[in-house]
Protein backbone atom coordinates (compact mmCIF):
# COMPACT_ATOMS: atom_id res chain seq x y z
CA UNK A 1 0.00 0.00 0.00
CA UNK A 2 1.55 3.31 -1.15
CA UNK A 3 0.51 6.82 -0.11
CA UNK A 4 0.06 8.97 -3.23
CA UNK A 5 -1.19 12.12 -1.54
CA UNK A 6 -1.90 12.82 2.11
CA UNK A 7 -4.56 10.32 3.12
CA UNK A 8 -4.89 8.79 -0.38
CA UNK A 9 -3.42 5.31 -0.90
CA UNK A 10 -3.13 2.87 -3.81
CA UNK A 11 -2.95 -0.86 -3.21
CA UNK A 12 -3.87 -4.39 -4.22
CA UNK A 13 -6.28 -7.08 -3.01
CA UNK A 14 -4.00 -8.12 -0.14
CA UNK A 15 -3.98 -4.55 1.17
CA UNK A 16 -7.78 -4.57 1.05
CA UNK A 17 -7.89 -7.84 2.99
CA UNK A 18 -5.72 -6.29 5.69
CA UNK A 19 -8.07 -3.32 5.93
CA UNK A 20 -11.15 -5.56 6.12
CA UNK A 21 -9.58 -7.64 8.86
CA UNK A 22 -9.10 -4.42 10.84
CA UNK A 23 -5.33 -4.81 10.67
CA UNK A 24 -5.11 -1.35 9.11
CA UNK A 25 -7.45 0.87 11.10
CA UNK A 26 -6.25 4.15 9.58
CA UNK A 27 -8.14 3.44 6.34
CA UNK A 28 -11.72 4.71 6.68
CA UNK A 29 -12.83 4.46 3.03
CA UNK A 30 -12.14 1.55 0.69
CA UNK A 31 -12.71 1.84 -3.07
CA UNK A 32 -12.63 -1.65 -4.60
CA UNK A 33 -12.29 -2.03 -8.38
CA UNK A 34 -12.74 -5.76 -9.01
CA UNK A 35 -14.60 -7.83 -11.59
CA UNK A 36 -16.02 -9.93 -8.75
CA UNK A 37 -16.02 -9.39 -5.02
CA UNK A 38 -14.32 -12.42 -3.37
CA UNK A 39 -16.58 -14.08 -0.74
CA UNK A 40 -14.03 -13.58 2.01
CA UNK A 41 -14.07 -9.86 1.25
CA UNK A 42 -17.84 -9.53 1.58
CA UNK A 43 -19.08 -7.18 4.27
CA UNK A 44 -22.54 -6.67 5.80
CA UNK A 45 -25.12 -4.69 3.85
CA UNK A 46 -26.51 -1.49 5.30
CA UNK A 47 -29.38 0.92 5.05
CA UNK A 48 -27.33 3.19 2.81
CA UNK A 49 -28.90 3.21 -0.66
CA UNK A 50 -26.21 3.54 -3.36
CA UNK A 51 -26.82 4.26 -7.06
CA UNK A 52 -28.40 1.34 -8.92
CA UNK A 53 -25.96 -1.52 -9.40
CA UNK A 54 -23.31 -0.09 -7.09
CA UNK A 55 -22.22 -1.90 -3.94
CA UNK A 56 -21.59 0.64 -1.18
CA UNK A 57 -21.25 -0.99 2.24
CA UNK A 58 -20.24 0.73 5.51
CA UNK A 59 -18.61 -1.07 8.44
CA UNK A 60 -18.27 0.42 11.95
CA UNK A 61 -14.91 1.94 11.02
CA UNK A 62 -15.04 1.63 7.23
CA UNK A 63 -17.09 2.77 4.24
CA UNK A 64 -16.67 0.68 1.11
CA UNK A 65 -17.57 1.29 -2.53
CA UNK A 66 -17.24 -1.62 -4.94
CA UNK A 67 -17.36 -1.10 -8.73
CA UNK A 68 -17.48 -4.20 -10.91
CA UNK A 69 -14.67 -3.40 -13.34
CA UNK A 70 -12.63 -5.75 -15.49
CA UNK A 71 -9.05 -4.95 -16.42
CA UNK A 72 -9.76 -4.91 -20.16
CA UNK A 73 -9.42 -2.16 -22.75
CA UNK A 74 -13.18 -2.01 -23.41
CA UNK A 75 -14.15 -1.47 -19.76
CA UNK A 76 -16.08 1.80 -19.44
CA UNK A 77 -14.52 3.81 -16.62
CA UNK A 78 -15.52 7.33 -17.67
CA UNK A 79 -19.14 6.92 -16.60
CA UNK A 80 -18.08 6.01 -13.04
CA UNK A 81 -15.37 8.63 -12.52
CA UNK A 82 -17.64 11.21 -10.88
CA UNK A 83 -18.84 8.58 -8.41
CA UNK A 84 -15.21 7.70 -7.61
CA UNK A 85 -14.30 11.37 -7.15
CA UNK A 86 -17.24 11.92 -4.81
CA UNK A 87 -16.29 8.88 -2.75
CA UNK A 88 -12.61 9.88 -2.52
CA UNK A 89 -13.42 13.51 -1.66
CA UNK A 90 -15.78 12.43 1.12
CA UNK A 91 -13.21 10.00 2.45
CA UNK A 92 -10.38 12.53 2.54
CA UNK A 93 -12.55 14.99 4.46
CA UNK A 94 -13.00 12.58 7.34
CA UNK A 95 -10.19 10.03 7.10
CA UNK A 96 -8.01 8.02 4.74
CA UNK A 97 -8.85 6.35 1.42
CA UNK A 98 -7.45 3.18 -0.16
CA UNK A 99 -8.13 2.68 -3.87
CA UNK A 100 -7.34 -0.89 -4.87
CA UNK A 101 -7.81 -3.46 -7.61
CA UNK A 102 -6.41 -6.99 -7.87
CA UNK A 103 -2.74 -6.12 -8.38
CA UNK A 104 -2.71 -2.36 -7.76
CA UNK A 105 -1.46 -1.77 -11.30
CA UNK A 106 -4.16 -0.82 -13.81
CA UNK A 107 -7.69 -0.12 -12.53
CA UNK A 108 -6.70 1.61 -9.31
CA UNK A 109 -4.00 3.54 -11.17
CA UNK A 110 -6.55 4.77 -13.71
CA UNK A 111 -8.85 6.17 -11.01
CA UNK A 112 -6.08 7.85 -9.03
CA UNK A 113 -4.57 9.30 -12.22
CA UNK A 114 -7.98 10.76 -13.12
CA UNK A 115 -8.36 12.10 -9.58
CA UNK A 116 -4.98 13.87 -9.77
CA UNK A 117 -5.87 15.25 -13.19
CA UNK A 118 -9.08 16.76 -11.85
CA UNK A 119 -7.84 17.96 -8.46
CA UNK A 120 -4.50 19.35 -9.65
CA UNK A 121 -5.29 20.17 -13.32
CA UNK A 122 -2.60 17.81 -14.57
CA UNK A 123 -2.35 16.33 -18.05
CA UNK A 124 -2.49 12.53 -18.31
CA UNK A 125 1.26 12.04 -18.62
CA UNK A 126 2.04 14.38 -15.72
CA UNK A 127 -0.57 12.85 -13.41
CA UNK A 128 0.57 9.31 -14.21
CA UNK A 129 4.23 10.27 -13.77
CA UNK A 130 3.40 11.75 -10.37
CA UNK A 131 1.59 8.56 -9.37
CA UNK A 132 4.46 6.38 -10.59
CA UNK A 133 6.89 8.35 -8.44
CA UNK A 134 4.96 6.93 -5.46
CA UNK A 135 4.00 3.56 -6.94
CA UNK A 136 6.35 2.47 -9.72
CA UNK A 137 4.13 -0.42 -10.86
CA UNK A 138 1.14 1.85 -11.65
CA UNK A 139 0.28 1.39 -15.32
CA UNK A 140 -3.32 1.71 -16.62
CA UNK A 141 -4.07 -0.44 -19.66
CA UNK A 142 -4.25 1.16 -23.11
CA UNK A 143 -8.04 1.43 -23.10
CA UNK A 144 -8.00 3.23 -19.75
CA UNK A 145 -5.31 5.61 -21.02
CA UNK A 146 -7.45 6.42 -24.06
CA UNK A 147 -10.37 7.26 -21.77
CA UNK A 148 -8.13 9.40 -19.55
CA UNK A 149 -7.11 11.35 -22.66
CA UNK A 150 -10.80 11.89 -23.44
CA UNK A 151 -11.24 13.07 -19.85
CA UNK A 152 -8.38 15.51 -20.42
CA UNK A 153 -9.97 16.72 -23.68
CA UNK A 154 -13.22 17.45 -21.82
CA UNK A 155 -11.36 19.77 -19.43
CA UNK A 156 -10.77 17.32 -16.56
CA UNK A 157 -14.49 16.61 -16.16
CA UNK A 158 -17.06 14.18 -17.52
CA UNK A 159 -19.05 16.51 -19.76
CA UNK A 160 -21.97 14.47 -21.05
CA UNK A 161 -23.07 17.34 -23.29
CA UNK A 162 -19.79 17.44 -25.21
CA UNK A 163 -19.40 15.81 -28.62
CA UNK A 164 -16.34 14.01 -27.23
CA UNK A 165 -18.44 12.23 -24.63
CA UNK A 166 -21.30 11.54 -27.04
CA UNK A 167 -18.96 9.83 -29.50
CA UNK A 168 -17.57 7.74 -26.68
CA UNK A 169 -21.08 6.88 -25.45
CA UNK A 170 -22.21 5.82 -28.94
CA UNK A 171 -19.15 3.60 -29.32
CA UNK A 172 -19.84 1.95 -25.96
CA UNK A 173 -23.47 1.33 -26.94
CA UNK A 174 -22.15 -0.33 -30.10
CA UNK A 175 -19.90 -2.58 -28.04
CA UNK A 176 -22.82 -3.55 -25.80
CA UNK A 177 -24.90 -4.35 -28.88
CA UNK A 178 -22.14 -6.52 -30.31
CA UNK A 179 -22.02 -8.42 -27.02
CA UNK A 180 -25.73 -9.15 -27.35
CA UNK A 181 -26.75 -7.02 -24.39
CA UNK A 182 -30.07 -5.19 -24.43
CA UNK A 183 -29.85 -1.41 -24.59
CA UNK A 184 -32.37 0.59 -22.62
CA UNK A 185 -34.25 3.41 -24.32
CA UNK A 186 -32.97 5.74 -21.59
CA UNK A 187 -29.45 5.19 -22.96
CA UNK A 188 -30.44 7.08 -26.10
CA UNK A 189 -30.49 10.87 -26.38
CA UNK A 190 -33.78 12.65 -25.77
CA UNK A 191 -36.01 13.42 -28.73
CA UNK A 192 -35.00 16.98 -29.76
CA UNK A 193 -38.57 17.67 -30.87
CA UNK A 194 -39.68 17.27 -27.26
CA UNK A 195 -36.84 19.22 -25.66
CA UNK A 196 -37.13 22.85 -24.64
CA UNK A 197 -34.45 25.26 -23.51
CA UNK A 198 -34.74 26.03 -19.83
CA UNK A 199 -31.43 27.76 -19.19
CA UNK A 200 -31.92 31.54 -19.68
CA UNK A 201 -28.17 32.02 -20.19
CA UNK A 202 -28.15 29.36 -22.91
CA UNK A 203 -31.19 30.96 -24.55
CA UNK A 204 -29.44 34.34 -24.51
CA UNK A 205 -26.24 32.89 -25.96
CA UNK A 206 -28.10 31.15 -28.76
CA UNK A 207 -30.19 34.18 -29.66
CA UNK A 208 -27.04 36.28 -29.58
CA UNK A 209 -24.85 34.09 -31.73
CA UNK A 210 -27.54 32.44 -33.85
CA UNK A 211 -25.09 29.87 -35.18
CA UNK A 212 -26.69 26.62 -34.03
CA UNK A 213 -28.64 24.45 -36.41
CA UNK A 214 -31.92 22.61 -36.26
CA UNK A 215 -32.54 19.76 -38.69
CA UNK A 216 -36.13 19.19 -39.77
CA UNK A 217 -37.83 16.55 -41.86
CA UNK A 218 -38.21 18.09 -45.31
CA UNK A 219 -41.68 16.59 -45.72
CA UNK A 220 -43.45 17.43 -42.43
CA UNK A 221 -41.02 19.89 -40.76
CA UNK A 222 -40.67 17.82 -37.59
CA UNK A 223 -37.44 18.50 -35.68
CA UNK A 224 -35.25 15.41 -35.93
CA UNK A 225 -31.89 16.67 -34.67
CA UNK A 226 -30.10 19.74 -33.39
CA UNK A 227 -26.46 20.77 -33.20
CA UNK A 228 -26.03 18.95 -29.88
CA UNK A 229 -26.92 15.61 -31.49
CA UNK A 230 -24.39 15.83 -34.32
CA UNK A 231 -21.23 13.73 -34.07
CA UNK A 232 -18.56 15.28 -36.24
CA UNK A 233 -15.81 13.27 -37.88
CA UNK A 234 -12.56 14.05 -39.62
CA UNK A 235 -12.85 13.81 -43.37
CA UNK A 236 -10.61 11.18 -44.92
CA UNK A 237 -10.36 13.26 -48.07
CA UNK A 238 -12.74 11.22 -50.18
CA UNK A 239 -11.92 12.01 -53.80
CA UNK A 240 -13.29 11.06 -57.19
CA UNK A 241 -11.49 11.19 -60.55
CA UNK A 242 -12.40 13.87 -63.09
CA UNK A 243 -11.98 13.12 -66.77
CA UNK A 244 -9.77 15.62 -68.61
CA UNK A 245 -10.54 16.76 -72.13
CA UNK A 246 -6.94 17.60 -73.03
CA UNK A 247 -3.96 15.32 -73.46
CA UNK A 248 -2.52 13.34 -70.62
CA UNK A 249 -3.96 11.00 -68.06
CA UNK A 250 -7.73 10.98 -67.86
CA UNK A 251 -7.58 10.48 -64.11
CA UNK A 252 -4.88 12.83 -62.86
CA UNK A 253 -7.29 15.41 -61.50
CA UNK A 254 -9.47 14.74 -58.51
CA UNK A 255 -12.20 16.56 -56.67
CA UNK A 256 -12.75 16.43 -52.92
CA UNK A 257 -16.08 14.85 -51.98
CA UNK A 258 -18.15 16.65 -49.34
CA UNK A 259 -20.19 14.88 -46.67
CA UNK A 260 -23.71 14.33 -47.98
CA UNK A 261 -24.96 13.11 -44.61
CA UNK A 262 -25.00 14.13 -40.98
CA UNK A 263 -24.06 11.51 -38.38
CA UNK A 264 -25.82 11.80 -35.04
CA UNK A 265 -26.05 10.05 -31.69
CA UNK A 266 -28.88 7.49 -31.34
CA UNK A 267 -32.08 9.22 -30.22
CA UNK A 268 -35.31 8.07 -28.63
CA UNK A 269 -37.40 8.78 -31.73
CA UNK A 270 -35.43 6.13 -33.67
CA UNK A 271 -37.87 3.26 -33.10
CA UNK A 272 -36.17 1.04 -35.69
CA UNK A 273 -32.97 1.14 -33.63
CA UNK A 274 -34.84 0.13 -30.49
CA UNK A 275 -36.31 -2.91 -32.25
CA UNK A 276 -32.90 -4.54 -32.10
CA UNK A 277 -31.77 -4.93 -35.71
CA UNK A 278 -28.14 -4.60 -36.76
CA UNK A 279 -29.09 -2.15 -39.48
CA UNK A 280 -32.15 -0.52 -40.94
CA UNK A 281 -33.76 2.65 -42.15
CA UNK A 282 -34.40 5.75 -40.09
CA UNK A 283 -37.85 7.19 -40.71
CA UNK A 284 -39.50 10.36 -39.47
CA UNK A 285 -41.50 9.70 -36.30
CA UNK A 286 -44.32 11.90 -37.61
CA UNK A 287 -44.75 11.23 -41.33
CA UNK A 288 -42.64 8.07 -41.76
CA UNK A 289 -40.60 9.66 -44.55
CA UNK A 290 -37.20 8.06 -44.98
CA UNK A 291 -34.45 10.19 -43.44
CA UNK A 292 -31.45 7.91 -43.48
CA UNK A 293 -30.20 4.65 -42.06
CA UNK A 294 -28.36 3.10 -39.13
CA UNK A 295 -25.79 0.35 -38.85
CA UNK A 296 -24.24 -0.78 -35.58
CA UNK A 297 -21.32 -2.20 -37.58
CA UNK A 298 -20.62 1.16 -39.21
CA UNK A 299 -21.06 3.00 -42.49
CA UNK A 300 -18.69 4.85 -44.77
CA UNK A 301 -19.44 8.54 -45.24
CA UNK A 302 -19.24 10.00 -48.73
CA UNK A 303 -16.05 11.78 -47.64
CA UNK A 304 -14.39 8.40 -47.11
CA UNK A 305 -14.47 8.24 -43.30
CA UNK A 306 -15.78 5.05 -41.70
CA UNK A 307 -18.16 5.88 -38.83
CA UNK A 308 -18.88 3.22 -36.17
CA UNK A 309 -21.64 2.86 -35.08
CA UNK A 310 -23.45 4.91 -37.69
CA UNK A 311 -26.74 6.80 -37.36
CA UNK A 312 -26.84 8.60 -40.68
CA UNK A 313 -29.27 11.32 -41.77
CA UNK A 314 -29.18 12.39 -45.41
CA UNK A 315 -28.93 16.14 -45.96
CA UNK A 316 -31.18 15.83 -49.01
CA UNK A 317 -34.00 14.60 -46.76
CA UNK A 318 -33.73 17.45 -44.26
CA UNK A 319 -33.88 21.21 -44.04
CA UNK A 320 -31.32 22.93 -41.83
CA UNK A 321 -32.08 26.26 -40.20
CA UNK A 322 -30.37 28.46 -37.63
CA UNK A 323 -31.98 29.20 -34.29
Regions found by a protein language model. Name each.
Residues 106, 225, 292, 306-309:
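Short functional micro-motifs and their immediate structural scaffolds
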Residues 1-48:
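Glycine-rich, flexible N-terminal cofactor/catalytic loop recognition
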Residues 293-300:
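Conserved tryptophan-centered aromatic signature that marks the ligand-binding surface of SH3
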Residues 82-96, 103-105, 113, 117-263, ...:
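PTP/DSP superfamily signal
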Residues 217-220, 283-287, 300-303:
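Short cysteine-rich clusters marking metal-coordination/redox-active sites
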Residues 305-323:
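Cys/His-rich, Zn2+-coordinating zinc-finger modules
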Residues 274-290:
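Cys/His-rich Zn2+-binding "zinc-finger" mini-domains, especially FYVE domains
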Residues 16-17, 35-40, 47-94, 137:
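Short polar/charged helix/loop
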Amino acid sequence: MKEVRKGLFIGDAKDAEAVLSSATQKITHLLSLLAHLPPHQSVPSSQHLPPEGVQWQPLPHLTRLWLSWKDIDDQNIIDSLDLCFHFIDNGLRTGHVLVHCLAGVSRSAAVITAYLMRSECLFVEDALSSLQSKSASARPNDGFLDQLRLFESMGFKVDKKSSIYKKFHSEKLGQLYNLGESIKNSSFAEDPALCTLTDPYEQHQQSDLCTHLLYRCKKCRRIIACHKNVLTHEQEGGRIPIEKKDKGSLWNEVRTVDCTSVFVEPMQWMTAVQEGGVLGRLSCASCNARLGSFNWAGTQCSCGTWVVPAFQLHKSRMDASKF
